[in-house]
Amino acid sequence: MHKKIFLLPLLLLLSCNALWAQLFVITVQNKSALPFTDQLIEVPWLPLQQMLSADGNLSFKIINATTKQELAWQLEYIGQTTIQNLLVQVSVPANASLKLWGIKGIPKKIAAKTDCRYVPQRKDDFAWENDKIAFRMYGKALQGTNEDAYGIDVWVKRTHSLLLAERYKKNDYHIDHGNGLDYYHVGHTLGAGNIAPFVEDSIWYPGNYTEYKILDNGPLRSTFELRYVPWNVNGKMVSVIKIISLDAGSQLNFVKANYQLQGGATFFPVVVGIIKRNEPGSIFFNEGKGIIGYWEPEDKKNGTTGVGIVVASGKNMLLQKSQILLQASLDGGAINYYTGAAWSKAKEVANSESWFRYLQQFQQKKSTPLIVKLQKGSSR
């Protein structure tokens, strides 16, 4: 009888150790004075796969080592046939660290927070969204029509749910039914942060995209590729491939534009731009940090949209009658930048001050990113 009593605590301890046996450990360090909230971290898959192989490639869950709360994650392929990264959504306070455990078990199902899709029934739209905001680009079917537009279109939202599939199915875009709408006008401009060559003081717009490829599609990150046929830029033919990613929890997209210029040149000036309305709005710029923010004039019915761009290689701001431009340089024919939007009616970014602060803090976080380390589990 006494032996059973003494053995019980030992059995409980052993069962707890088995429950939390770690296949791997991820340490996330935040050296910034800013908190990171709902941020995606990337863990290279190959070393992680080797750790899992030792345990027979069992399915796994990821938990907060302190709270034991299960975290959402995604396997990222980036268009490849094999896994490239493990993506995990984390929140880390300023000047703090976080430890995650990978443990055996079947992960909980999570609702998708991002989506991207080709929409042939709407004249080749390519649309994408997350739990904050939505966007679309126009395809070749719209080119040359009176609906044609060169830039990125914004679809504002005030719901964390995905809505594009439902709204496209209903052919209903321009009325707010309580969850958002597309009231943003693009026209023959760069819209909400598109990019184009800038030669002889002129923007040389490409046509609309002609090919697409979905590289990943949720639940935490959606990535896709848009291709454009070559077009004339001051007497030379130029082509571009754009890769666009949108993470859950972010107001901004990541854009990588790869240009090819006739003759093999890899340097020519480009601009990233935002359409400017005729009525007064608020403009913020920091050329040294490569930030431009625009808080549009209020629409009495639909509220206010804020648009912003962050370009590490940005150098000169150009203010035109209808556009705000940030001139940038290519690195080997490529450029990376961020662009996105927010809506006052979503009540997360309510005014110009909060939008411009968001953009500045976004740039600061990219300058001091989270440090991610992967280790083998300490117990089996």
Where in this protein do the model-derived segments appear?
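Solvent-exposed N-terminal domain segments of exported/luminal and surface proteins
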Residues: 105-203
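Short, well-ordered beta-strand segments enriched in hydrophobic/aromatic residues
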Residues: 24-30, 132, 242, 253-261
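Alpha-mannosidase-like glycoside hydrolase catalytic domains involved in N-glycan trimming
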Residues: 22-116
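Extended, loop-rich substrate-binding clefts of extracytoplasmic carbohydrate-active enzymes
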Residues: 170-247
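Polysaccharide-binding surfaces and accessory modules of carbohydrate-active proteins
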Residues: 23, 27-29, 50, 56, ...
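Bacterial Sec-dependent N-terminal signal peptides
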Residues: 1-25
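Acidic (Asp/Glu-rich), glycine- and aromatic
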Residues: 240, 252-285
